[in-house]
Amino acid sequence: MPAFDLTAPYSPKGDQPTAIKQLVAGVNDGERYQTLLGATGTGKTFTMANVIAQTGRPALVLAHNKTLAAQLCNELREFFPNNAVEYFISYYDYYQPEAYVPVSDTYIAKTASINEEIDMLRHSATRSLFERRDVIVVASISCIYGLGIPSEYLKAAVKFEVGETLNIRGQLRELVNNQYSRNDTEIARGRFRMKGDVLEIGPAYEDRLVRVELFGDEVEAIRYVDPTTGEILQSLESINIYPAKHFVTPKDRLDTAVQAIRSELTERLDFLNTEGKLLEAQRLEQRTKYDLEMLGQVGYCNGVENYARHLAGREPGTAPECLIDYFPKDWLLIVDESHVTCSQLQAMYNGDQARKKVLIDHGFRLPSAADNRPLKGEEFWEKAHQTVFVSATPGNWELEVSGDEVAQQVIRPTGVLDPIVEVRPTTGQVDDLLGEIRDRASKQQRVLVTTLTKRMAEDLTDYLAENEVRVRYLHSEIHSIERIEIIQDLRLGEYDVLVGVNLLREGLDLPEVSLVAILDADKEGFLRAERSLIQTIGRAARHVEGVALLYADNMTDSMAKAISETERRRTIQQAYNEKHGIVPTAAGKKASNSILSFLELSRKLKTEGPDADLVQVASKAVEALDDDADGMALDALPELIDQLEMKMKEAAKKLDFEEAANLRDRIKQLRQKLVGKV
C-alpha cells in the first residue's frame, strides 16, 4: 500500500501522465538526478504530488524563499489532507547577524526575534520525520543550516505509556533537561505543570496540551487536551515528548566541549600574541572566558551556536547536521524553481564565511565559529541521494547532471497556448504600448510592463498616469504586504497596468494578464537573458489571448532562443488541442490565497460596515489605525487587541506569516495607544 493518499478533483492530463510515469520510473530505478521541464501553467505542483504519492518516499520540497514555500505547502496540503505536510523555514521574524566593520571599528551584536509559531512548525516537521513515513516537508534554503544531532534529539525524548510505573521526579528532571520550563500557573508551549496526580505538558511541536493522569506512580491515562477549553480531544496509549529545542547536549558532552573550547582558546591566544595582536587577544580571552563560565553554570550562553562544533563533537571542517539528516535513507528531494534555488545553495555558505572570517581575525570569535555554518553546495548534494529539479527554465548544471533524464511538460490541461510573441521597433514604443494598453483595458484584461531600470519604470508610470491609464509601479522598496496588495488589486481590476523592473518573481501567476511588454528587449544582460525572457513571456501564458511584445531594434541570441522555445511549446499545445478537440479555456483561478485573505477581508469591510462581525471589525481597526486611532474609545481598545491577536494566530496557522507579522506590529501600536490614554 502506498504511504500517501493523493486527493484531487481531477486526474493527470496533457503531458502530466507521461512526465509522472518517466519521473516515477527514474526514482524507482535509482536515477540520482532528473529534471521536470514544465512550462508555466502546466500543473507542475500536481505532477510533483503524483511523483511523491507513487514512489511513497518521504520528500523534501525545496523552495528559494519562504513565500513560495508557503504557497507550495498550502497546495500540497490540499492534495494530501490525510498525510503530514510540514513547513520548515527560518524562525526569525527579524535577524541581524553578528558582524564587525574594521574600517569604522564598529561591532554589531546579533539581534533576533523568534517567531514561536514557525518554531512550532519546525519541531512538528522533525517529529513527523521520526514517527511516520508519509511526510512531505516544504522548506526554504534555511534547511541547510545546523539543526542539532538527530540521534541525540530522539534519544532525549521523554516517553509516557499507559500502565507504566514512573519515577515522576526523574521524568520531570528530564523535561527540564530538555529545556521545558515548569510553570504551575500558566501552561503554554515549552512549559509543563504538575498539580496533584496530573502532569500537563505543552509540547514544542503542538498547539495542544498533553495531559498525563497518574494513580500513584502509575500512568492511568494520556490525553490530548484543548489548552483553552480543557476539552479532551484524544486518548493515547503512549506518547514521546521531544525536546523543546533541537540542540540537545548531554551533560558529559557539555563537559567535554568546555574543555575543548578552553584548549582552542589557549592555542588561539598564543597565535594572536605571537602575531602582536594584543587587542584581539585580550578581546577574545575576555569574551570566551565569560561564555565558558555561562556554559559551565547554566549550560547556555549568548551566541552558543558559535561553539556548535565542540558541542556536537565534530571534527574541524566537517559538515553540520541539518534537517536533511532527520530524513530516512530513501528520501526524495524536489527542488522547485531550480534555476534559482540551486545557485543559492553555494551562495549561502560563501556569504556566511566572509562575515565569520572578519570576526575571527579581529578576536571576536574562535576559529571553530566558522564551522557553525550552512552546508557547502557539494556537501548538500552528497546528502541528497535522489533529486528531481523542477523549473520552466532549468539551469545548465541541472540539465547537465540529469543527462537524458529530462521530462517535458509543455501541454496545459486548459488548452491555453503560449503567448504570441511579436518583436516591434523601439521607435515610438511608448505610444505604441499605450494603444495596446487601452485596447486590453477595454476588454477588462491586464498588462505587465517590464523596463531595464527603476528610473525608466518611474517615468513610464508617470506618463501612463498622465494619459489616464490606471497604472501602478512595483519596485524593490515596496514591503511584502503592500507588494501582495498591489498584485491583488491588479487581479481585481483596481487598475489595469503593472510596471516594474523585474517582474519575474515567483507567485506572479496572473490569469487576467493578457499582455506582457518587454522594453529594450535587445539589451543583453541578466534581465534580458534567455531564461529571463522565457519567464517574463510566461506571465501571459495563462490567458487565452496572451501576447508578449518585445520592443527591440536587433534580434539578440537570447531573444531568438526565447522566441523559438515559446513557439515550440505553442506548436505542441496547438497539435494536442486539435487532436483531442480541446478549446482553450482560461484557468478559473480565484484571486485569493492564504497570503491575501486578510486583504480580501479588509475590502469586504468597506461595504459591510457595522454589520460585520467582531473579527472583521478588528480588521477594519487595522485599516483605520493610522488615520483615526486617537478617536477610538478607550474601552474599545482591549477588545480590538484581543480580536487582532486571534486574527494573528489564524494567519500563522495558515502559514501566512507576513500577515501575522503585520498584525503583530499593529497590536503593538494599539497597546501603545492604550497605555498613552490610561
UniProtKB/Swiss-Prot annotation:
Motif Beta-hairpin per record, residues: 91-114
UVR domain sequence ranges: 638-673
PROSITE patterns membership: HELICASE_ATP_BIND_1, HELICASE_CTER, UVR
A GO CC annotation given for this chain: excinuclease repair complex
InterPro entries for the chain: Helicase/UvrB_N, Helicase_ATP-bd, Helicase_C-like, P-loop_NTPase, UVR_dom, UVR_dom_sf, UvrB, UvrB_inter
Keyword Acetylation: no
Gene3D superfamilies xref list: P-loop containing nucleotide triphosphate hydrolases, UVR domain
Keywords: ATP-binding, Cytoplasm, DNA damage, DNA excision, DNA repair, Excision nuclease, Helicase, Hydrolase, Nucleotide-binding, SOS response
Xref: Pfam families: Helicase_C, ResIII, UVR, UvrB, UvrB_inter
GO BP term (any one): nucleotide-excision repair
Record-listed ATP binding positions: G38, A39, T40, G41, T42, G43, K44, T45
GO molecular function, one term: ATP hydrolysis activity
Chain's role: The UvrABC repair system catalyzes the recognition and processing of DNA lesions. A damage recognition complex composed of 2 UvrA and 2 UvrB subunits scans DNA for abnormalities. Upon binding of the UvrA(2)B(2) complex to a putative damaged site, the DNA wraps around one UvrB monomer. DNA wrap is dependent on ATP binding by UvrB and probably causes local melting of the DNA helix, facilitating insertion of UvrB beta-hairpin between the DNA strands. Then UvrB probes one DNA strand for the presence of a lesion.
Family that this chain belongs to: Belongs to the UvrB family.
HAMAP family for this protein: UvrB
UniProt comment concerning the protein's domains: The beta-hairpin motif is involved in DNA binding.
Name listed for the protein in its UniProt record: UvrABC system protein B
The organism of origin for this protein: Synechococcus sp. (strain WH7803)
Lineage: Bacteria, Bacillati, Cyanobacteriota, Cyanophyceae, Synechococcales
Recorded name of the encoding gene: uvrB
